[in-house]
């Protein structure tokens, strides 16, 4: 019998095309795997790495201020954010204690036990984030008992997962009882992506506030905005506000420089750019991270947008007693919209045991 060569499927062709395209591009080198780690706990690792980022940044800030230095500082900040984004899932898992929950349906014959130990969580972190590969970290990421849920039957038997083309079933290896298996996902998982984007955007807002947005504003734009202030007979420094700069940029067709409104306002007024201390900037970021889960819990079901960033930073500044910062965060003009944000904010404050200060 003559063997007939198997024809390539469309999937095979697509895979070949993708492989060819990837081979034409120089991919970013990934961190090589090590065999050991200098850290012994997740808490120690996170604190140690954050401190390392801060020390690198401080060393550059204390040196000569050049464009190259600013680019390096910006890269360190991006690396720190990416590190935190990679680490957050393991921090959340680390806080989960070993729990046992009974399946509540009347016809259910199985019990599910979630096994998430601190040791295995740290080992998985080492493998995925620190790139530490050794027998213990490999066991942590491959052993079903540390990753998946363990199902047991009421008779004491262990479950086995049987999968066919139409459904998956849990089958007891002792009494033969069966139950459909349905994977479940937490709301946190589906919203983590948006939370990460918000954290990145907050970092951009804080950079803009301090004139560190990295975009050079042409002198012609500065002159055009300055001319608008002159036309409107605005000359005192207290009246040259970022909100007014944004209004003039829109009028002049320079909306692409919205992120530079603080820099432009400072250049026209002659007031030095605001500088936040590292401690205050870190505190603002920490507070922002803390409100993510409470916001998701208390937001109206149909609401897709997050709270106004100006509103959030305004409320943070109030809580921290940084009243001199309030002028930099203009609030929404509509009382109804402000009230709607206050309603959510009050619930967030209750959850976190923060003082609630009404806006309207």
Curated annotation (Swiss-Prot):
<dbReference type="InterPro" id="IPR014900">
    <property type="entry name" value="VLTF-3_Zn_ribbon"/>
</dbReference>
<comment type="similarity">
    <text>Belongs to the nucleo-cytoplasmic large DNA viruses (NCLDVs) VLTF-3 family.</text>
</comment>
<protein>
    <recommendedName>
        <fullName>Putative transcription factor A494R</fullName>
    </recommendedName>
</protein>
<dbReference type="Pfam" id="PF04947">
    <property type="entry name" value="Pox_VLTF3"/>
</dbReference>
<comment type="function">
    <text>Putative transcription factor.</text>
</comment>
<keyword id="KW-0804">Transcription</keyword>
<dbReference type="InterPro" id="IPR007031">
    <property type="entry name" value="Poxvirus_VLTF3"/>
</dbReference>
<keyword id="KW-0805">Transcription regulation</keyword>
<feature type="zinc finger region">
    <location>
        <begin position="153"/>
        <end position="175"/>
    </location>
</feature>
<dbReference type="GO" id="GO:0046782">
    <property type="term" value="P:regulation of viral transcription"/>
</dbReference>
<keyword id="KW-0863">Zinc-finger</keyword>
<dbReference type="GO" id="GO:0008270">
    <property type="term" value="F:zinc ion binding"/>
</dbReference>
<keyword id="KW-0479">Metal-binding</keyword>
<keyword id="KW-0862">Zinc</keyword>
<dbReference type="Pfam" id="PF08792">
    <property type="entry name" value="A2L_zn_ribbon"/>
</dbReference>
């Amino acid at each position: 019998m003559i063997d007939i060569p198997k024809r390539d499927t469309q999937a095979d062709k697509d895979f070949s095309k993708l492989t060819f395209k990837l081979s034409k591009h120089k991919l970013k080198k990934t961190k090589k795997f090590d065999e050991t780690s200098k850290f012994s706990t997740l808490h120690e690792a996170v604190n140690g790495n954050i401190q390392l980022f801060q020390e690198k940044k401080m060393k550059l800030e204390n040196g000569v201020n050049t464009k190259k230095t600013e680019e390096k500082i910006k890269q360190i900040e991006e690396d720190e954010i990416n590190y935190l984004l990679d680490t957050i899932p393991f921090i959340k898992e680390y806080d989960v204690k070993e729990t046992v929950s009974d399946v509540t349906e009347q016809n259910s014959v199985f019990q599910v036990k979630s096994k998430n130990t601190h040791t295995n969580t740290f080992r998985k972190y080492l493998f995925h984030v620190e790139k530490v590969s050794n027998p213990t970290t490999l066991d942590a990421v491959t052993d079903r008992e540390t990753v998946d849920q363990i199902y047991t039957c009421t008779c004491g038997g262990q479950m086995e997962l049987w999968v066919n083309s139409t459904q998956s079933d849990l089958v007891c290896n002792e009494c033969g009882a069966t139950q459909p298996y349905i994977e479940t996902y937490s709301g946190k998982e589906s919203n983590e992506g948006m939370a990460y984007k918000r954290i990145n955007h907050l970092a951009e807002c804080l950079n803009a506030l301090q004139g560190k947005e990295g975009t050079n504003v042409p002198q012609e734009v500065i002159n055009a905005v300055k001319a608008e202030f002159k036309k409107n007979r605005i000359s005192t420094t207290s009246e040259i506000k970022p909100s007014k700069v944004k209004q003039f940029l829109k009028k002049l067709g320079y909306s692409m420089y919205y992120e530079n409104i603080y820099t432009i306002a400072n250049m026209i007024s002659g007031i030095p750019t605001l500088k936040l201390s590292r401690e205050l900037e870190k505190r603002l970021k920490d507070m922002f991270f803390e409100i993510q889960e409470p916001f998701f819990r208390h937001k109206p079901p149909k609401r897709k947008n997050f709270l106004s960033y100006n509103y959030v930073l305004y409320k943070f500044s109030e809580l921290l007693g940084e009243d001199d910062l309030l002028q930099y965060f203009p609030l929404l003009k509509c009382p109804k919209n402000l009230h709607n944000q206050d309603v959510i904010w009050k619930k967030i404050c209750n959850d976190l045991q923060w003082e609630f200060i009404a806006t309207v």
